[in-house]
Amino acid sequence: MAYIIQGETGDWEIVIGLEVHAQVISKAKLFSGAATEFGAEPNTQVSFIDAGFPGMLPVINEVCVEQAVRTGLGLKAKINLTSVFARKNYFYADLPQGYQISQYDQPIVGEGELILDLPDGGTRTVGIERLHLEQDAGKSIHDMHPSKSFIDLNRSGVALMEIVSKPDLRSPEEAGLYLTKLRSILRYLETCDGNMQEGSMRCDANVSVRPVGSTELRTRCEIKNVNSIRFVQQAIEFEARRHIDVYESGGEIRQETRLFDSVKGETRSMRSKEHAHDYRYFPDPDLLPLVIEQSFVDGIKSGLPELPDEKKARFMAEYGLNAYDAGVLVAEKASAEFFETVAKGRDSKMACNWVMGDFFASLNATGKTIENPPVTAANLGQLIDLIKDGTLSGRLAKDVFALMVETGKAPAVLVEERGLKQVTDTGAIEAAVDAVISANPDKVQQVKDGKTALLGWFTGQVMKSTQGKANPAMVNEMLSKKILG
């Protein structure tokens, strides 16, 4: 369903394009051998090149090139065998060279696509305009001293992939889905860790609005360096409504760069939006054009892992899962692997229900990650086995799972220790059934008179009297025979 904002003069739609800066996983920077470890002491991972010392020549890091190509292939994009690095000229204190080495009109990766997984199980394709490599800038720190700012150049020269979408997104929710899917692909490819809280994935959102039915692309504003998916969505929503208010009051939108204030939930003007000519792009004279062989690309392609879309299709075909469940499970590589371990040789639907239900809930409740879960895949699989062989009822299994989260013990151990084994002894179950029937003659008569839904109530009473240990199927069968004959 289309996302429409109702204004005073009519209905409006949002047009959104996203630029994502993804920090490349590499032990060294794009043009120097300095380390890239997050959280190091300020200015301890800086080479003369990163600090902009005169006469220092950049040397391309082949690993970063491989990572860019790998990402491009993961986005089903065209790999350009010849690309050019250009100088993007601007002054800022944390850019000691006085320019950023980037790529302009000849990027390493051309057009591609990304498939959004929609909440209703459907999909939508978003175009990728390009991916190019560039240096990150340093970091300005303004909150360490009341009257001074400090510069940390550890980040200066770190390799970034700027991934630019086409203006195909139409709602804050779609923007969130796009970022979630892109982060998933990058993590599967192991080209970026996607940790937005550490700044290794940052987003600029380009936002404009137009009347519903129009195909015109109106003036856009760019919201810079938003560092969480939720904030990106909030920023887009606010900015779109600001545009509509301006248009409906007879004004015009000025193309500009804006910042998002996450405390106030609003954007504010940062500077007028620069155009390409403002940066005086020209090919970097210290770097030859980057020429790669098709065999280099083919070698990387042959080593690509199974990506989320392919894994989702396989989960649907192999395990019989619906599109939504498969999409949730493959969103993170670790959750897909966890599910496959649990489901191996077992009822895949039951495995899916347990992983997406109780197990995911336990992660939220304990604050643990799937890499260090409160219940291992092996133990969850064993719990499913105990349900299947009749040792545990569904209700007892829930209790055992809670104990597994609490103690970390295997389900078989807990069943033995706590005497939680399901009662399948006919004599014991029959005694419990007889007791409930004899205590409720009025309800027995109602069942005989046709109110068969009450059989469920009788089952509940028997389960209660046996502390959930009776086999529900045996209880149901016995009640039906004894009451209805």
Curated annotation (Swiss-Prot):
Q: Which reaction does it catalyse?
A: L-glutamyl-tRNA(Gln) + L-glutamine + ATP + H2O = L-glutaminyl-tRNA(Gln) + L-glutamate + ADP + phosphate + H(+); L-aspartyl-tRNA(Asn) + L-glutamine + ATP + H2O = L-asparaginyl-tRNA(Asn) + L-glutamate + ADP + phosphate + 2 H(+)
Is ATP-binding among the key words of this record?
A: yes
**UniProt keyword Protein biosynthesis present:** yes
- Which superkingdom does the taxonomy of this entry point to? Bacteria
According to the UniProt entry, its GO molecular function terms are: asparaginyl-tRNA synthase (glutamine-hydrolyzing) activity; ATP binding; glutaminyl-tRNA synthase (glutamine-hydrolyzing) activity
Which is a GO BP term held by this UniProt record? glutaminyl-tRNAGln biosynthesis via transamidation
- The set of disulfide-linked cysteines is none
For this protein, the record's SUPFAM superfamilies field holds: GatB/YqeY motif, Glutamine synthetase/guanido kinase
Arranged from A to Z, the UniProt key words for this protein are: ATP-binding, Ligase, Nucleotide-binding, Protein biosynthesis
Q: What class of enzyme is it?
A: ligase
Q: What is its EC number?
A: 6.3.5.-
Self-association state and partner proteins as the record states: Heterotrimer of A, B and C subunits.
Q: Give the protein family.
A: Belongs to the GatB/GatE family. GatB subfamily.
Record function comment: Allows the formation of correctly charged Asn-tRNA(Asn) or Gln-tRNA(Gln) through the transamidation of misacylated Asp-tRNA(Asn) or Glu-tRNA(Gln) in organisms which lack either or both of asparaginyl-tRNA or glutaminyl-tRNA synthetases. The reaction takes place in the presence of glutamine and ATP through an activated phospho-Asp-tRNA(Asn) or phospho-Glu-tRNA(Gln).
Q: What is this protein called?
A: Aspartyl/glutamyl-tRNA(Asn/Gln) amidotransferase subunit B
Which organism does this sequence originate in?
A: Paramagnetospirillum magneticum (strain ATCC 700264 / AMB-1) (Magnetospirillum magneticum)
